[in-house]
Structure formats: structure tokens, C-alpha cells
Amino acid sequence: MKVKPDRTLDCLGLYCPEPVFKTRLELDELKVGQTLEVLADDPAAESDVRSLVKNLEQELVSVGKEGNTVRILIRKVK
């Protein structure tokens, strides 16, 4: 089942550390249970956002790649 995000954060063209900072700010705005889709093309974004999600104890729902773009879906759990 495909999860429809509540918000999408477009980080295409942004490089470290901007995708992580912007993801953190967006997660702070979400309500528990909502999902955030992050789109990025920085090669470091996937691992950086994964680390952020783990450190914030949120749920990494899925990670997908299409060409140079990574799509990361995060659910706020607390």
C-alpha cells in the first residue's frame, strides 16, 4: 500500500546540510501520525536524513530512488 504524504519537502538542488535542516524544521511542524515526503538529489541526503530520523526516533516508512532523485517518506511518531 502506497502512503500518501501529508507534506512534501522539495530539496532538489540543495546540498548538505540544507536537506537535513529543512527536514528537521518540517518534522517539527507535523502532527503525530502525519507523513513527510523528502525529495533530494544530493548524494549525501539519503544517509543524512536516515540518521536524522533515527536520532529523532521517528519512523522511516520508505526510501526509493528514481534516477538521481531519492524519495524518503517519514512518519512522525512522537
How should these model regions be labeled?
Residues 4, 33, 67-69:
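A general secondary-structure signal for short beta-strands and their flanking turns/coil
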Residues 17-61:
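Amphipathic, hydrophobic secondary-structure cores in small proteins
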Residues 4-12, 37:
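Short amphipathic
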Residues 2, 14, 29, 63-65:
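Sterically constrained small-residue positions within well-ordered secondary structures
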Residues 50-78:
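C-terminal structural segments of small proteins and small subunits
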Residues 1-6, 77-78:
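Compositionally biased, disordered extreme N-termini, encompassing classical targeting presequences
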